[in-house]
Amino acid sequence: MGGRTLHFHLAGINNQNFIMSDEETGTWWQQVSGCAVVGPLAGRCLETIPWDEVTFEVWKREHPNTLVLRPAADAREHYAAADWEKEIARYPTVTPIDPQDRLQPRDLVVGVTSGTVAKAYPWTALVAQNPIIDTLGDTPLLVLLDLDGRSLRCFDRRVANETLDLFLRTGICPPAIVDSRTGSEWDFSGLATAGPLAGRRLARLPCLKDYWFDWKTYNPNTRVFTAGLPSGS
């Protein structure tokens, strides 16, 4: 930041979202946005780098020579043995509840932004409909789960100035993502592995698996993908 490297540690939690403090200036930074909220660097934002929400199985498959960071030998003693999700669910959220909401505060969503437009895709809808095809702003979007049902990625559906319509072809082993125009097959990395478009790659888009209350707090004007959701609150 500004030509120097900052070193961070956990300073606290705001609405169940980490607040980090840098040792160099004492500025506090919000985890979800990477932006400074209090201190000399308030208003500045860290550059976002690509990240992945995948299981180690998927990561190892795509990066067979990967290294693994070994945890400190005494790290376990700093963590409670109880189920973290059940433990954290005891604490209230501070996000105002809209009676018109069709999602509960702790429902999981996939959050995606395109320019100034944000949209939340309920995890239950993705599991039921995988993949989800949508358009967000000017971006034709693919929201995709791997066959493990846990690993998540999002892609721009445009290839060579053409927008692809993609679907999951079952009845083959393993199932494959196929575009309806050319019949090309695509893997979870976004690479076309067979067909006329073999070798082409879909552009990755950042997406975040998050709780609804957290996503809505920091994206108050977010839209919600409602196809397949039950009606009512």
Where are these regions (language model features)?
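Mid-to-C-terminal functional-domain signal that highlights helix-capping/loop sites
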Residues: M1-S233
